[in-house]
């Protein structure tokens, strides 16, 4: 059965189709005969309890520089849609949170993927703390003294904003680095929220693995290796993608968290693993499926739509 699918995303003109997961999901939906609609989060509205968006009919093509066509914008009641993909990138701020409140009003009659209430209640750097034995030593605080004590305990640490994304604002403070005090001052000025400190994992030099799970089951993995001059492995900031397979420890991690992901209705999730430790659970807009398909032929977009269609 053909579905009406609205994609809530950053504007389609801004995506890099070579590595964009939302684009891959849209291509697969179109291939299956589903009707695609596009809208940016700032086109979402609610009036008198009716949730709507100014949507444009969308066609996509796997052609750089000519990857989309949009129709004329039309205000549509989103209950007319069968599926909405919640796919705009973080930051996970009040704008983002407000969209989850609005979309929650129409879910699950209109299937919102991922479930907007659970997306709101599962920020990736906090959700992961539900599994403390699977992650490195971690501190969430805005108290500078707590961070300095943590640094004295572990020497090398990572300091990053609690609601950042794409590697922005991530700092490696090696033992003896004298920048911690000034960094804490800067973080206090830039961020109203607490920030996060973690024990530095030296295994990151060998890569930070992104594992994709569909309905709580691992379906593919990608290793991201940082450059020689950067502590971050995110592909947005120059991390090099490499083909990878799951280790026994990574399968153990997936088996532990899988039931919780299914219980919360998370269809598409990406987790980050360094060595033996999980560092994040990404439920907002996980990436990596295009790279995985290029490396080993696994069509994760097809597995995603199989899971979505089974719910319709």
Curated annotation (Swiss-Prot):
Cofactors demanded by this protein: Mg(2+); Mn(2+)
Cofactor note: Binds 1 Mg(2+) or Mn(2+) ion per subunit.
Keywords annotated in UniProt: ATP-binding, Glutathione biosynthesis, Ligase, Magnesium, Manganese, Metal-binding, Nucleotide-binding
Residues given in the record as ATP binding sites: 151-207
GO MF annotations in UniProt: ATP binding; glutathione synthase activity; metal ion binding
Pathway annotation: Sulfur metabolism; glutathione biosynthesis; glutathione from L-cysteine and L-glutamate: step 2/2
GO annotation, cellular component aspect: cytoplasm
Listed PROSITE patterns: ATP_GRASP (PS50975)
Keyword Nucleotide-binding: yes
The EC number(s) this enzyme carries: 6.3.2.3
Source superkingdom: Bacteria
Catalytic activity: gamma-L-glutamyl-L-cysteine + glycine + ATP = glutathione + ADP + phosphate + H(+)
Official protein name in the record: Glutathione synthetase
Gene it is expressed from: gshb
């Amino acid at each position: 059965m053909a579905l009406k699918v609205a994609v809530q995303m950053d504007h389609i003109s801004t995506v890099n189709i070579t590595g964009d997961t939302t684009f891959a999901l849209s291509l697969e939906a179109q291939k299956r005969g589903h009707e695609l609609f596009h809208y940016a989060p700032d086109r979402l509205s609610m009036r008198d309890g009716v949730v709507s968006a100014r949507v444009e009919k969308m066609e996509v093509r796997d052609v750089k520089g000519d990857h989309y066509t949009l129709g004329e914008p039309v205000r549509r009641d989103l209950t007319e849609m069968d599926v909405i993909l919640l796919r705009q990138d973080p930051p996970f701020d009040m704008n983002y949170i407000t969209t989850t409140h609005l979309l929650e009003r129409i879910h699950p009659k209109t299937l919102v993927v991922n479930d907007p209430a659970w997306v709101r209640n599962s920020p990736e750097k906090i959700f992961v703390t539900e599994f403390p034995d699977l992650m490195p030593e971690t501190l969430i605080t805005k108290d500078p003294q707590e961070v300095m004590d943590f640094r004295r305990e572990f020497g090398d640490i990572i300091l990053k904003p609690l609601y950042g994304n794409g590697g922005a604002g991530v700092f490696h403070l090696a033992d003896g680095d004298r920048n911690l005090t000034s960094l804490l001052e800067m973080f206090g000025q830039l961020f109203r929220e607490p920030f996060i400190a973690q024990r530095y994992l030296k295994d990151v030099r060998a890569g930070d693995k992104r594992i994709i799970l569909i309905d709580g089951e691992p379906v593919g993995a990608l290793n991201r290796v940082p450059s020689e001059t950067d502590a971050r492995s995110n592909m947005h900031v120059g991390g090099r993608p490499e083909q990878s397979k799951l280790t026994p420890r990574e399968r153990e991690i997936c088996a532990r968290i899988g039931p919780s992901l299914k219980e919360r209705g998370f269809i598409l999730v990406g987790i980050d693993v360094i060595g033996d430790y999980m560092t994040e659970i990404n439920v907002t807009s996980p990436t990596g499926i295009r790279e995985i398909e290029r490396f080993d032929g696994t069509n994760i977009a097809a597995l995603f739509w199989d899971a979505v269609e089974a719910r319709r």
